[in-house]
Swiss-Prot record:
This is Clustered mitochondria protein homolog. mRNA-binding protein involved in proper cytoplasmic distribution of mitochondria. It comes from the Eukaryota. May associate with the eukaryotic translation initiation factor 3 (eIF-3) complex. InterPro entries: CLU-central, CLU_dom, CLU_N, CLU_prot, GSKIP_dom_sf, TPR-like_helical_dom_sf, TPR_rpt. Residues 631-661 have a biased composition (Acidic residues). Residues 665-675, 1287-1301 have a biased composition (Basic residues). PANTHER family: CLUSTERED MITOCHONDRIA PROTEIN HOMOLOG (PTHR12601:SF6), EUKARYOTIC TRANSLATION INITIATION FACTOR 3 SUBUNIT EIF-3 (PTHR12601). HAMAP family: CLU (MF_03013). Residues 1-27, 606-694, 925-966, 1276-1311 are annotated as: Disordered. One of its GO terms (cellular component) is cytoplasm. The gene is CLU1.
Length: 1311
């Protein structure tokens, strides 16, 4: 049984199987670093240097690696507490300036213990602006920001709150398993306001400096108001900052004379001189900041932070909108007066980064880090531009075209709509096909970027979904807008103008060959409209373009895999079903990869089979040769030996010596010549066998033609034959998807081989990993029959409904003006989720806003719950070929569906207790409507509100909620914000992944030291390339935490798991499945370290999140609840532990059934828990049930059955003893004339017996003596008592039958 318990407590998300060899990764870690003389510097060398600061010649020791770059050391310096004030400086070694982009090893005569001097530089205007931004951040003077892309509270983390509660928990409370989800767990506890260091620091209205002062070195002017209330006018000069003579009405930026003539190179130092209270306040601010985990405070720079779907109300401390004049000046501080700092040539940057050398490890690190940062910057810029385009803030380049055909350029990014504005996809499904094609294109670009083929370039590509619009952002390829000469094609390779013309520029062949080989695409023929044949390396839809920069670009990567023809034929054959929206139903690249592997296995099997007979024949021939050779050698040896014995004795002696020779090869009595021949012969035989068994996989080749079933018309018989063969291969791939991929997934889930998904995101990830398209959700839901797959069915149906709602909402939002979108979203949500509270919801629109948009399409007003349900049912039937149950809307889990919808549409809802039913309304106080960002509206009658509204209409539109006469679950004010959903094409780091995989392999091969070095190298590479706050870094922390846990490095595992939790919360989401699993791992590792109390609190938090993400009774909860019960036993909380075991058993019975081995295992553990909780009778009953199930399922000889039998015997013996002792006590009391209600928990001997029995490591034989089942039954009857007159005993049994009821009465939980 111990083995089963350990199995249940295994870390979540086991590491994937490695793919690369340790030799490859050894190359990653072992490329030598050389100094300027070419001499090798050992990799693990660390130089101890001393940084000498300019003020007071203060010295700071610093340890650096020789392969670090100087600008990394610079960054480390400015993050040190003693050097915070420096931002504009250079470093010098022995009087010589050091290049910021050189490696430490390249510094001339650098040696361990050397001093590096920090030398302050003159400021430029840009450096002065950067310095001001940095100082504002450091002293906490920067106010809150309104960010259109990242939303409200981006990169939220609740770890600090959870950890504080875990540390401060004094006693283990009774956990409410039946309680509903608590959305408060999604938000951190409100902190005290941070200490204020200055009242204000802002750019002066005297900016920019006039020409004659600019000539004197003036860069910008500032105003600082200290905490003492004094205001100072500051000049930013090339030499630093000083107090000037200006006032708010008089301009004199020259230095002030007299006692207040303060000046300093750093603004931070200057403020310290100006304000006596600053130093103390700044120290308090740093102390305040240090109370939180550093990872939860760092700014996220290399990824778009996760935006929470539930945010505090506008009146909360976390979202208070404070006045900050500099917030309006930030665009100037960031990009300057001319706004030239932020304009970047994205395409040139991408392609130049791709062309960087990648020979050595440091070259690859630098290249991949630059590419990662570049993609992060581009994705952010493209998302911001897309939001502006969607809101109508950017003028189109072709305003006379239809809305969907308009194109835009903003911030050097080219934008277009993901719709069929020019009729390109008319035959494929119009707008729907165009929408799918853009998503497939960005995935294709990501795949090509990952392959990193030399000489083949892609534009930076991003797809943004925002308020129903899909917008594509691409870096501008040089020459893409160029007007071509007559007869010259716009495209150099692939289809031109649909598929009427096909271009075949030979310059693209080498690169497209590499691409097609990697993507398993078959070189094939296509035909233009005139029937002319063209041989292409890739799909006709994949285009090649030679830019004016001479680079070869690949475009339109939405058809890199073949069509799912089985799906198309199936939906076309359904006469009564609605038509599928488009014909862009391509197979996933993951499926093609899996199918090719399957084909490879089949090929290897056939090769083995082919060689089988030949091998047998060859073996027979060799046996004959060996027999002949042996006979010759025997005759030779017999003639050479001299012996006086007869011939038969000689033969016996010879054979005996041969046998000894096999055991002892150095026996001298055997002829050396014969032994040598035998050895050579065996070696040759082994070599032959090895060479014959080895199959060269490079001989295998299997590719698919992506253009079959897409209108290609072969001309000759040979071409038709080739096309038919290609079509068969594609049909086989489609068959593999339906007959193998989907059934394998269902089987793995049914057998608990993999974790069940919890929500739509995890379901999508799981299906895509298995190569299954989401259009098969309907089939998966239909096939998920039985209690074991009920969870999968629920998640699949929820996902289909949420996606159906998303498409319906997108149609209404697409052309709606921004101020009306909150009314639209809230009304549609009321129709979906609020009908149990208000069966006839009405849309709430501010009349003043309505009057401003006379031409707006307000069709959402007419949507009723019935219309919305019908529309969702149609979408689900159309897209997933699934028919929802007739009353599906009555069974929706309200909060979970709200979360799914918000995540899909990017909605940020106001945090409140949502009222979904009339019963819920009775227990909730009436909500107070918000009229503006900082105040509450008085609760008045609706008529009065309407009059007020009419009077105030011309000045400021009031809150819509105040005019509401009938309450709704959602009101427009609940929709706080909408953030864009971004799909990017950023590649992952190949270098970091190689090191991680090789580390795993080394550990599997028991090369622990090398493995750990490689794991550390991988961690370092991930952090260097991505930055610390990135989803990929969260995942590597997760993987490494588990690997270190398996290596018994428990402290390191806990630290990595803690980092994984925080980084995942901030970059993936507070309530994502990945974050939840990270919390469970952290909990498990803490338990193994002996901190059961804190481990239990993290488990409870994970369960609370589970309720929000999925709800109760998720199959994977069984393991988690079981683990928590074990933790409670460790804390000697026996009664609470028993409640957790009972809950685990309840879910197990729902999922696996009562008569299952899983239930028997939990019954076994529950029986032990009952014994510890002083319930001997119940313990015997549960152990007997466990024994009977094991006996029926596994047989009498199984170790689990024997162990249960042994426990049953001992528990029964102890229970009989306790029952007998209780009867004796009762009889003595009766004789004395006193009668008490007996309680097992009150008898002293019970506690001792229970503790004695329930030790998990009990010292006794594993296989107990067999017991007569009838005697056990008799003993049970004796324990339970047959005397009907003992009413108190009967009452006690009733109470024990439902242990959950015992929560109301005091229960002894003594050790």
């Amino acid at each position: 049984m111990a083995e089963k318990t350990n199995g249940a407590a295994a870390p979540n998300g086991a590491a994937d199987a490695p793919k690369s060899s340790p030799e490859q990764a050894q190359d990653v870690a072992d490329v030598p670093v050389t100094d300027e003389n070419g001499e090798q510097i050992p990799e693990d060398t660390v130089l101890s240097l001393t940084i000498v600061l300019p003020q007071n010649s203060e010295k700071i020791p610093i340890a650096v690696s020789p392969h670090e770059q100087v600008h990394e050391v610079r960054q480390s310096i400015i993050e040190m507490p003693n050097a915070l004030q420096y931002s504009c400086f250079h470093l010098e070694h022995k009087g010589e300036r050091i290049n910021d982009f050189a490696q430490i090893s390249e510094i001339k005569d650098i040696a361990d213990g050397d001093e590096i001097h920090l030398v302050e530089d003159p400021y430029t205007e840009k450096e002065a602006r950067i310095h001001l931004i940095r100082v504002r951040e450091l002293i906490g003077a920067a106010g809150d920001r309104t960010d259109s892309v990242q939303g409200i509270l981006p990169g939220l983390s609740v770890y600090d709150t959870v950890a504080a509660e875990a540390r401060n928990a004094t006693e283990v409370g009774e956990y409410e398993f039946n309680a509903g989800p608590n959305v408060k767990a999604l938000l951190p506890k409100e902190n005290d306001p941070q200490p204020k260091t200055v009242k204000a620091i802002q750019v002066s209205p005297w900016n920019p400096p006039p020409a004659h002062f600019r000539q004197k070195g003036h860069l910008l002017y500032l105003i600082i108001t200290t905490n003492e209330g004094e205001q100072f006018q500051i000049t930013g000069h090339v030499g630093g900052f000083f107090v000037n003579k200006s006032s708010n009405s008089k301009f004199d930026p020259l230095p002030r004379a007299g006692p207040k003539a303060y000046a300093a190179h750093s603004l931070l130092t200057l403020i310290e001189q100006l304000s006596p209270a600053f130093s103390k306040a700044f120290a308090e601010l740093q102390e305040y900041t240090n109370q939180r985990e550093p990872l939860s405070t760092f700014q996220i720079t290399n990824a778009i932070p996760a935006a929470p779907w539930l945010v505090p109300s506008a009146n909360s401390a976390a979202c208070t909108h404070t006045p900050d004049i500099t917030r309006t000046q930030e665009s100037f501080l960031v990009s300057g007066v001319e706004n030239t700092d932020t304009l970047r040539d994205w395409n040139e940057e991408f392609q130049s980064a791709k062309e960087l050398p990648k020979d050595g490890v440091q070259d690859r690190v630098f290249r991949e880090r630059l590419i990662s940062k570049l993609f992060a910057d581009y994705n952010d810029a493209a998302a911001r531009g897309a939001v502006l385009v969607a809101r109508g803030e950017v003028a189109p380049l072709n305003p006379t075209e239809g809305k969907d055909a308009q194109i835009f350029v903003y911030n050097n990014v080219f934008f277009s709509f993901g719709a069929d504005g020019v009729g390109t996809f008319t035959s494929e499904g119009g707008d729907e096909a165009a929408r799918v094609a853009t998503a497939k294109d960005v995935s294709g670009v990501k795949l090509v970027n990952q392959l990193d083929i030399d000489g083949l370039y892609t534009p930076g590509t991003v797809v943004v979904d925002y308020l129903g619009k899909r917008i594509v952002g691409q870096s501008i390829v040089p020459g893409i807008f160029k007007q071509r000469e007559p007869g010259e094609n716009q495209i150099d390779y692939g289809a031109v103008d649909g598929k009427d013309l096909v271009a075949t520029d030979e310059r693209f062949v080498p690169q497209f060959q590499k691409l097609s080989k990697a993507l398993k695409v078959k070189p094939h023929a296509v035909w233009d409209k005139e029937g002319k044949r063209h041989d292409l390396e890739g799909s006709v839809e994949t285009k090649g373009l030679v830019g004016t920069d001479g680079r070869k670009y690949v475009l339109d990567l939405y058809r890199i895999t073949p069509l799912d023809v089985s799906w198309q034929e199936e939906v076309e054959a359904e006469s009564d079903a609605p038509e599928y929206p488009h014909r862009m139903t391509v197979l996933r690249p993951e499926l093609v990869e899996l199918f090719v592997r399957q084909k490879m296995r089949e090929w290897v099997s056939s090769e083995v089979a082919k060689r089988g007979q030949a091998k047998k024949d060859q073996a027979a021939v060799e046996e004959k040769k060996e027999a002949k050779a042996e006979s010759e050698e025997d005759s030779d040896s017999s003639s050479e030996e001299e012996s006086s014995s007869d011939e038969s004795d000689s033969e016996e002696s010879s054979s005996d010596e041969d046998e000894e020779e096999e055991k002892k090869p150095k026996k001298k009595s055997v002829p050396k010549k014969a032994a040598k021949k035998e050895e050579v012969k065996e070696e040759k035989k082994d070599e032959k066998e090895a060479s014959s068994d080895r199959i060269d996989v490079s001989d295998f080749s299997f590719t698919l033609n992506p253009d079959v079933f897409s209108g290609q018309v072969p001309q000759t018989d040979a071409e038709k034959e080739a096309m038919a063969a290609d079509e068969k291969d594609v049909r086989d791939a489609c068959e593999y998807l339906r007959k193998t991929a989907i059934p394998d997934l269902l089987n793995d889930l049914r057998e608990s081989e993999i974790s069940f998904p919890m929500d739509g995101q995890s379901l999508s990830r799981l299906l895509h990993k298995r190569g299954i398209n989401l259009r098969y959700l309907g089939q998966i839901a239909t096939a998920s029959d039985g209690p074991r797959l009920q969870c999968l069915k629920e998640v699949s149906v929820r996902e289909m409904i949420a996606r159906g709602f998303k498409h319906v909402a997108a149609k209404h939002l697409r052309y709606l003006p921004l101020p009306l979108t909150s009314s639209c979203i809230s009304h549609l949500l009321n129709c979906l989720l609020g009908t149990a509270f208000n069966a006839k919801p009405t849309a709430e629109i501010d009349p003043s806003i309505r009057s401003l948009y006379d031409d707006a399409d307000l069709a959402f007003e007419n949507v009723t719950p019935e219309i919305l349900r019908t529309a969702i049912q149609e979408e689900v039937a159309r897209r997933f070929r699934y028919t929802l149950a007739s009353d599906w809307y009555n069974n929706l889990p309200h909060l979970h569906m709200l979360r799914e919808v918000c995540l899909k549409l990017g909605i940020q809802m106001q945090h409140k207790e949502f009222i979904f039913t009339a019963e819920g309304a009775a227990s909730q106080p009436a909500p107070v409507p918000v009229t503006n960002g900082n105040g509450n509206a008085p609760a008045e009658g609706s008529k009065k509100n309407k009059k007020k509204k009419k009077a105030a209409r011309d000045t400021s539109p009031d809150s819509v909620t105040s005019s509401s006469t009938i309450p709704h679950t959602f009101v427009p004010d609940d929709i706080i914000n909408v953030v864009p959903i971004v799909k990017d094409s950023s590649p992952r780091s190949v270098l970091a992944e190689e090191a991680l995989e090789a580390g795993r392999i080394s550990i599997l091969q028991n090369q622990r030291k090398i493995g750990q070095e490689l794991l550390l190298e991988s961690l370092s590479l991930h952090e260097q390339i991505y930055g610390i706050l990135h989803p990929e870094v969260a995942r590597v922390y997760h993987s490494l935490a588990m690997l270190y846990f398996q290596l018994e490095e428990k402290d390191a595992a806990v630290e990595l798991a803690r980092k994984a939790v925080i980084v995942a919360e901030r970059t993936i989401g507070v309530d994502s499945q990945e974050t939840l699993l990270d919390y469970l791992n952290l909990s498990l590792f803490l338990y193994q370290l002996g901190d059961s109390k804190q481990a239990l609190e993290f488990t409870k938090h994970a369960l609370n999140m589970w309720k929000i993400i999925y709800g109760p009774d998720h199959p994977d909860m069984i393991t988690t609840i079981n683990n928590a019960a074990v933790m409670l036993q460790q804390l000697k909380e026996y009664h609470e532990s028993r409640r957790w075991f009972e809950e685990a058993l309840r879910i197990c019975e729902v999922v696996f059934g009562r008569q299952s081995v899983n239930s028997a295992t939990l019954l076994f553990q529950l029986a032990q828990a009952l014994a510890l909780d002083q319930e001997p009778k119940a313990a015997v009953v549960k152990m007997k049930e466990s024994y009977n199930i094991f006996l029926a399922e596994l047989g009498p000889e199984d170790k689990n059955t024997k162990e249960a039998e042994g426990w049953l015997e001992q528990l029964t013996t102890n229970a009989v003893s306790i029952a007998k002792h209780a009867k004796d006590v009762e009889e003595r009391r009766l004789r004395a004339g006193i009668r008490f209600t007996p309680r097992a928990g009150a008898i002293g001997s019970t506690s001792t017996a229970a503790n004695k029995v329930a030790k998990s490591e009990i010292e006794r034989p594993a296989a107990a003596s067999s017991m007569d089942s009838r005697s056990i039954d008799e003993l049970l009857k004796f324990i339970e008592g047959t005397d009907k007159q003992k009413k108190p005993a009967a009452k006690k049994r009733t109470g024990r039958a439902n242990p959950k009821r015992r929560g109301a009465e005091p229960v002894s939980t003594k050790a």
